[in-house]
Amino acid sequence: MALDSQEIRQCVRKLKENDFELAYLALLTREGLKPLSRWEKPLDDHGLELLQQIGLLTKQIQRTVKTGKLVSETIFSTSPGYIQLYEKRFAGKPIDKSAETVRFEGFLFGFPPCCVDEYIRHPYAKNVLAPQEQKVLFHWACRDCKITSALLPGYRRIHEYVEKC
């Protein structure tokens, strides 16, 4: 199904009604710019159906926070392998921000490894991106990152598409 098809546009509009960021993440994942995405806010069956209608596989994963409270995450991808990797590593487990976890999540979410390593050492370190460029990313770019520079045109294209839907 082509990105400019009426069905895709309609699903994106409906996802956008829920949350712009959800629609944007979904299309970045559908178009292969992100191998896997995670939605940390509640998502009902209708939202899951919309993700599936645009060609994404979905899975809801239960995790815990430090207080022991259960939280539900929705993960989605075009590849069952990424969903299985995430589920095996994180289902039923507490959320943690260890360097090991951040590296693994960075891999799954398609973040440049150099940016992940820099973020672990120095979160939100100054980079050379204009604020409007950093805003369309889901990772914090490291200084002079060549991979981020290569990703940005695709991210901008999808961001503009979602804005126009």
What does each model-found stretch correspond to?
Residues 99-106:
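An amphipathic, hydrophobic-aromatic interaction surface with interspersed Lys/Arg
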